[in-house]
Amino acid sequence: EASMLVASLSEVSVFTLEKDTFLPVSYRFSRGGMGKSKDIEMDFDWQQKQVMGTDRDQSIHIPLNRGMLDKSTYQLALQHDVAAGKTSMSYQVVDGDEVDTFDFRVLGEERVRTKAGLIDAIKVERVRDPTKSNRKTVLWFAKDWNYLLVRLHQIEKDGKEYQIMLKSGEVDGRQVQGKTE
């Protein structure tokens, strides 16, 4: 959860893990303030094989197939798959009343700079169809810290760049500490 002076954001996923398969149960997203409010509620009914809910007051009702994830749980599945040594990953992600395919590939190992120091990481890129999007996203997962996402670099269609970098953190009761130069 994050909150700013004039805006708020909350994203919550409930899921189960069944033999290395993430099964979403519910997904809630709420953003308020700055004139861009958005509310999403989705429930994943595995017995009825349906995703039901609302996205910006529009009803969602789509068939649910094994392997489908919400917009938060796929990130955990990606982290899990990188930790398992997979090099090419594809996820079916429910986005409103559609199901999008998110593809990723491992680019290799790299020592990456973060606010917590230099971290040995696995570098992963989001694979997009260049005829549909020139947006680029690269992620780094820390090898020695349970594959925690420690850095993300995104270049938008308009060329604007964004970077998210780990400042501090704790994994299994230990303070995340990178190497010094």
Predicted regions and their residues:
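Acidic, serine/threonine-rich low-complexity disordered tracts
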Residues: 1-46, 84-181
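Hydrophobic, well-structured mid-protein blocks that either form specific transmembrane helices
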Residues: 36-81
